[in-house]
């Protein structure tokens, strides 16, 4: 029951994702970070198959870092999105990745931006996006309450509404969510919304 969503505010972008690592009927952990920090000013939220998600997002992160190392310049958000789309499209014809992506970034000349990319490499620049079962409710809430000029506080309030709606409407809802923000100061973790915590397993004596 994965849920990943993001939206663009006045001078920032936010990505939120559930933190459950599940397989079939089993929950392996509830603190899995599904939002990769690609570089100082880019975030990539991903959902779907756990192995594909982890491998593909790390592959993109390392290639973005390689480009910066070789050229001494950061990729723009649009360039990173198109590179990611190209890699997904290439893999689609060989060994496809089952991964859906929301890529957010901040560029000094254009400001914040958000890109929606599905597992068949369809790419769109959007103001708001969501994947997973929670997207049915998150998109409805964002359609109703979203404005392009929202402040950070207003967006966080909307994100909390989306999380509460997901928790109340899904039969097996993810308990915890992680929120990350990106603005001119860079990409960083903003907040957790937790209803349960993973306790450390005691060591047998």
Where are these predicted regions, by residue range?
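Long, low-complexity N-terminal extensions
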Residues: 1-205
């Amino acid at each position: 029951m994965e849920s990943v969503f993001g939206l663009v505010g006045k001078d920032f972008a936010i990505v939120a994702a559930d933190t459950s690592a599940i397989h079939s009927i089993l929950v392996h952990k509830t603190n899995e970070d599904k939002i990769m920090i690609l570089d100082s000013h880019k975030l990539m939220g991903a959902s779907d198959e756990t192995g594909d998600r982890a491998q593909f997002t790390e592959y993109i992160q390392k290639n973005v870092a390689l480009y910066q190392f070789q050229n001494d310049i950061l990729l723009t958000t649009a360039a990173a999105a198109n590179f990611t789309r190209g890699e997904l499209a290439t893999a689609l014809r060989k060994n496809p990745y089952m991964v859906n992506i929301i890529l957010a970034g901040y560029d000094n000349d254009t400001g914040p931006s958000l890109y929606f990319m599905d597992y068949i490499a369809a790419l769109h620049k959007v103001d708001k996006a969501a994947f997973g079962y929670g997207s049915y409710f998150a998109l409805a809430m964002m359609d109703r309450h979203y404005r392009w000029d929202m402040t950070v506080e207003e967006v966080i309030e909307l994100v909390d509404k989306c999380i509460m709606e997901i928790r109340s409407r899904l039969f097996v809802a993810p308990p915890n969510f992680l929120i990350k923000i990106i603005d001119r100061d860079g990409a960083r973790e903003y907040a957790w919304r937790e209803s349960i915590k993973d306790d450390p397993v005691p060591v047998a004596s």
